[in-house]
Structure formats: structure tokens, C-alpha cells
């Protein structure tokens, strides 16, 4: 099998709104702590970043959910904070706190001193992990590469970690907008290089996680988040190995800006559970694919409830192509693995009725 041949291209077809035989599915954080086998490899690695920095181990955990479930894509096991870590901010993961940076970005001078790490140098370990994943997949399903959005990365760099209010980050936007624009531009160009490196290493689809875009007001969202995701898109290759490389933008809490997001020229728009699939399809479904949007907490319900919610999501989107089933955010560590199986089985059983029975999912 050649490196470009795929046994299952269902998700790539769905992102292009082409006919498929059933609704494709993958899950945000599908390789993670809810799986016992992941926890074993994580312990072997010694630390979270140790796991990310080992191409062999990263590829192993990337493959784990595909060994359990009939998924239509793999997503690289890594973290959105690899870029700020490579900028020298000193990333640590503290139990009960999450990511914490030793050095915060506090001033305009701090912004101007930040280096721009290269995909082929400081971040080479991520590219090696992508290549290792492609080799392990051997054409089974496509590999998704990803990054955080400039605004989301900036919040961690400015706050020094997670935040409930983003007060320091927003203060920069309000008080020093020129410095904020310099930071976003530096991050956008670094992200573009990072994603280009992932594509060169073998990623077949891309996703930009704008996790904290929904914390912004409409003016600042368009100016400091969306504009820089657009800047990234303009620097990305959109085809490789004879195939479209679909790019999905996901702004958590971004339902009010769907038209603006679709205007960027992305291929897919990620939805959280606060946005109706039916409403999103009515507004932008003629231009982009839609990804989502089961509430991750639903996977703590019993299998009958999960099946009912899968059916509701399918009914909301309706008949025809252009839907990639996913959660509305990352799967939670306490999720029972058997409930994931119940969700996927329900989707496989129920979704073919919404598609053309003559559609194919193999490489054409």
C-alpha cells in the first residue's frame, strides 16, 4: 500500500460534503486518561511531556482508541501547548491545576523577546510523532494534526496557566492592542509553520482548537482570534498526495459567529453542545462541513440515553453529507470506555439511514 492510499476515507469525504455510506466519527481527546492502556503508557513515559516527546510512545497511544473502537480518524497525540513550551516559557503539568508556565508573558518587551520555534528544529519531535503515526496507521484511517489558536495559546502564556476570567489576557487586548497584535501575529506564523510541518510529515487533515475564543466579546473575537486563524489558513497547503487537506476551526462557545468562521475558507466548523446542529446547518451547512456535537457528559449516562442522544444529533443534522460526528469538547477522564462503545455502535446502526446507500467510503 502506498503512503497516500487509504482503506477508509469516509471522514475526508464528509469534510468535503461528498456522499458517504454512514456518518464518520472521531472524538476529541480520544487517546487519553479514560483508557487504562493509555495510563499504562503514560506511567512508562514518566511525565506527560515525556510522552509527547517520544514519537514511539505518542504513536502507540494515538493508535489505542482505534484498537478498541471503529473510528474513522486518528488524531495525533500531543498538546496545544507545545509551541509556548518551545518558546522557553517552562511548561509543567501540576496535579489538580493543569498546565503551569514558569515564565509568564507580562509586557510588550516580553512579547518582542519571544523566539519563533521551528517545526523542523525545536518542534521536530512532534513531526517525528506524526510520521510514526502514519507508519503505524498504514492507511487504516486518516491522521488529523492539530494546534491551538493564537488567542488560546496566548491566554496560557499571559495567565501562566488556566484561567476562569482571562483578566490579564483581556487587559492586554484593551490596554496594549498593538502589542497584542504583535503577539498574535508571531503565534499565527509559528502555528502556520507548525501545521505545515505536520502536513509534510503525514497529517491528512488539520484542526485548530480555539478553546477560549468564546470568552471574548464579538469585536475582540473577530480582531484577535478569528483574524489570526484566517492568517494561518492563508499559509496552509490545501492539497497533498492528490487529496484535499481539510481544515476545521473549533471555537468553543462560538455559535454566534458561525458565519464569520465559515467565511475564513475553512472546510469544517466544530460545534459545541450549546449550538443546534439544525440551526448551524441552516446558517452555514451549504459552505462547510459541521463537526459535533454531543455533550461529553452524556457519556456518563446509560446506553439507552446515549443511543437516544445519538439519534437526536443525527435527526438534528438531517439527511445528506457534511456531518462529522464528534463530542462538543474533549472526552472526560472519568468516562466509562464501554459507554464510548455504546455511542459508536448506535451511530453505526442509526446513521446509514441518513445517507445514500450507494455511497462508498473507500479510496476512489
From Swiss-Prot:
* Annotated site location: Transition state stabilizer: 79
Quaternary state and interactors: Homodimer.
Q: Which UniProt keywords apply?
A: Cytoplasm, Decarboxylase, Lyase, Porphyrin biosynthesis
Q: Name one Pfam family in it.
A: URO-D
Describe the function of this protein. Answer: Catalyzes the decarboxylation of four acetate groups of uroporphyrinogen-III to yield coproporphyrinogen-III.
Compartments in which it is found: Cytoplasm
A GO term from the CC aspect: cytosol
Catalysis performed (reactions): uroporphyrinogen III + 4 H(+) = coproporphyrinogen III + 4 CO2
Q: Return the protein name.
A: Uroporphyrinogen decarboxylase
Q: In which pathway does it act?
A: Porphyrin-containing compound metabolism; protoporphyrin-IX biosynthesis; coproporphyrinogen-III from 5-aminolevulinate: step 4/4
| Gene Ontology terms: biological process | protoporphyrinogen IX biosynthetic process from glutamate
Q: Which residues bind substrate?
A: 29-33, 79, 156, 211, 329
